[in-house]
């Protein structure tokens, strides 16, 4: 059975920078999502890490660590708060395209993610360079969706 706290503790021994952040994130086990994700709870204004324990089953410890780093980086880089793109109404909004852009930005720095994670240079992002900002990837995704409607429909 997967115990998130064990793997968070291992991560913090290697990466103490994330200790304060980890204590501020509510961790919620759920089967309502297939993987893991962070969000802001609008009622409490706190970060929440939602995770499906089945997603972590069968991963190596290195993969589990990189998935946790991936989620923590979303908080550190303000991907779910201040840097959200502005929609047509002038409101900041989380979109699938922004989520993919932020995943590309983070994942280009992580080498032990499980198969299936979006990465620059792989699959539909084969022509995307590594180590760009989320905003860079977002602009590229928008342009690719404009140039190729089928690409945009996948978002």
Cite the ranges covered by each PLM segment.
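Short, functionally important secondary-structure microenvironments
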Residues: 1-66, 72-155
């Amino acid at each position: 059975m997967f115990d998130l706290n064990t793997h968070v503790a291992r991560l913090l021994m290697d990466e103490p920078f994330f200790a304060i952040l980890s204590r501020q994130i509510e961790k919620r086990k759920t089967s309502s999502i297939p993987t893991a994700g962070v969000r802001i709870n609008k009622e409490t204004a706190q970060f929440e890490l939602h995770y499906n324990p089945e997603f972590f089953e069968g991963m190596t410890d290195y993969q589990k660590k990189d998935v946790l780093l991936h989620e923590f980086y979303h908080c550190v880089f303000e991907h779910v708060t201040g840097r959200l793109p502005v929609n047509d109404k002038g409101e900041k909004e989380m979109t699938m395209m922004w989520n993919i852009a932020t995943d590309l930005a983070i994942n280009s720095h992580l080498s032990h993610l499980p198969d299936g994670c979006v990465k620059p240079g792989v699959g539909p992002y084969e022509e995307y360079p590594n180590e760009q900002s989320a905003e860079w990837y977002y602009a590229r995704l928008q342009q690719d969706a404009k140039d190729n409607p089928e690409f945009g429909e996948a978002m």
